[in-house]
Amino acid sequence: MKAAFDIEKHQLFISASVGISVFPSDALNAEQLLRNADSALFKAKNAGREGYALYTEELTVHALNRIEVASDLRRALEQHELRVYYQPVHDLNTSRLIGVEALVRWQHPLRGLVPPGEFIPIAERTGLIAEIDAWVLEQACWQMCQWQSAGVDLSFVAVNISSRLFARPELYTLVSTVLADTGLDPALLELEVTESAVMDDSQGALEQMHRLRALGLRLAIDDFGTGFSSLLRLKRLPVQKLKIDQGFVAGLPGDNDDVAIVRAVIALSHSMGLQVHAEGIEQIEQAQFLLNLNCNLGQGYWFGRPMPASELDWQRAPAISR
């Protein structure tokens, strides 16, 4: 199924996630069978998509938990329980902190800080992710304005845009309204969209990106290397940056496959005039290796974890030697 389909001069890709529930061992009626298969499908998608999962009784417990979390998450939006944390992004050449990525966190009144891996997939499944994205965008822009007023020298604040929100025509209006309301210079805002979101509707994505780019902001492809984008499509996108997925960075510098992929992505990016941003840097050896490959920017626990705006250390510049 990974093979491309050529339809009207466009290359299209399809994939499948499958949830399996068996009659009569898993259920005694069609309604329950479908419900259990849906739980298994959620597990398959959570495991990275493009695979299958079998139903187990444990999934029913997970399904009930998802319903509870989804209900709590709706309340969290209304009760202002969400928080925006910021993870520093460093210039690998100078080690200087030059930007931040805005990341949502949930401060639950009873459970404390809920891990994003626990509620983001549910937010995506229920459609709440678009509303969360919009809120994070507004908060990040206001915060960037405050930093600018305080004299903090930052080149950009990056905000993730989910595939659900990216596919909506009203995204342009949302972004332009937030920029107008906050007064933030559009050049200081970077929107990140995943490679898979762009490939889901390449023509629609291209039009959406050109509209957003016309506002004067920056665009980045997140998790690059995890999808099936063609170079022909990539060169048409009005993006300024490719972000290397942390899954490829984790194996550096010892994994030969990761080394080959990262080296190729960096070379490709530079040949197209794009910046390269590596995520998931947890060791100095990874930072040094990426610097030697001429990667531009780095982000990860070695530089700093996501944290509240008040806790960012603007002077931190860990030395990286070639």
Where are these regions (language model features)?
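Bacterial c-di-GMP phosphodiesterase EAL domain
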Residues: 57-184, 196-197, 210-211, 231
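Surface-exposed amphipathic alpha-helices with a cationic face
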Residues: 2, 144-148, 179-180, 206-214, ...
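Cyclic-dinucleotide signaling modules
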Residues: 1-67, 71
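Heptad-repeat coiled-coil signal-transmission/dimerization helices
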Residues: 34, 172-175, 202-205, 209, ...
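EAL-family c-di-GMP phosphodiesterase catalytic domain
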Residues: 10, 24, 92-96, 109-110, ...
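Short glycine/serine/threonine/alanine-rich loop segments
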Residues: 10, 49, 82, 128, ...
